[in-house]
């Protein structure tokens, strides 16, 4: 199936590393296992500071679903268990042993029954890789998904491409074969043909995939790479019982690597990007999953007060505090560095804005059709919070036809029934990142949706499963 998306916005941000750039290798001293994505689920920590762990060792377990573990990506020693407000679990920090783990696993995918395969996924931390829709929560083992969507079309700013992720392996063919094994495992686990969404520029091993998966391509501006866009065009979610699972290309590689090679895939590709980073430092690295920022960035840049650190891309990433020695998030493959200006731009309201991004023709650049305008992004808000006036501008950049402003208003009044009627079941917080970015009212739509979905999932979805 060929999907063409017309709505959205092509973001050309300054600071992207060169796609042809060489991938250097960094073996970090510290890594962390990010537990924030599991916020709707109560977790039981299985380790204490001082414990020795190996790649694949259980670090935490789902309290409500016994036997589902979150595991360590590396060998090392647990040094800290970080908690936030109300003792909420944030991450488990590990002092990594040098080198790659040699802990060997032996699973024969062909001989495993579906029931045995599920136990392997739960035990080895593979089930924790899936996300569940609606409500964008960690996948629950009590649910049987209607469909599984595998995303190979992620086009968030600065996110490494599929080709870059294949740099982890000796050859592109080797990487694709590992991916095929991962797809085979998913198809057998759930007894269905998963949907694989890629772009036209990718050359997939279709002869190996066509019998075990549905293949689709998508074309269009950001956010055409969003799983919500794929689900909407291929098989829409129409009610709360319409459960689907989503998973990324990199996570399928982790599944295939365990079954084919017998080792935990503890490495990942990371992009160092952002306009605050000198061009010579913008690059791709091969490093451990959850690596600490201080091991990947030059000391003078990491400690600078004029730079904002983000784990992930600039639109959906997590703001990090330097004093907490931040590490990469669970699903993050980018470290973004943005300038943090201390003063506002003088007479900004009088400037023509030839190189400023606008979707409302506030600046001169909005009246000229140029193929690409490279925007120099920083953390300046360029104004204060205002009431929502023009609700139509959000629909211009939303790839899914949902009334963005009405959903936000329903969520702010905690009217979930109305929000679901308007289309909340089809979306995730990341789908509101672009409307938040272009919003003249400065409303934090991304945060509103994220917190509302978390609250609703805790009270209604997780406890009833």
Curated annotation (Swiss-Prot):
Catalytic activity reported: a ubiquinone + n Na(+)(in) + NADH + H(+) = a ubiquinol + n Na(+)(out) + NAD(+)
Pfam family, one: NQRA_N
Keywords, alphabetical: Ion transport, NAD, Sodium, Sodium transport, Translocase, Transport, Ubiquinone
Leader sequence segment: none
EC id: 7.2.1.1
Domain of life: Bacteria
GO biological process per UniProt: sodium ion transport
Enzyme class: translocase
GO MF, one example: oxidoreductase activity, acting on NAD(P)H, quinone or similar compound as acceptor
Function: NQR complex catalyzes the reduction of ubiquinone-1 to ubiquinol by two successive reactions, coupled with the transport of Na(+) ions from the cytoplasm to the periplasm. NqrA to NqrE are probably involved in the second step, the conversion of ubisemiquinone to ubiquinol.
Family membership noted in the UniProt record: Belongs to the NqrA family.
Subunit structure of this chain's protein: Composed of six subunits; NqrA, NqrB, NqrC, NqrD, NqrE and NqrF.
NCBIfam families: nqrA, PRK05352.1-1
Name used for this protein in its record: Na(+)-translocating NADH-quinone reductase subunit A
Lineage: Bacteria, Pseudomonadati, Chlamydiota, Chlamydiia, Chlamydiales
Protein's gene: nqrA
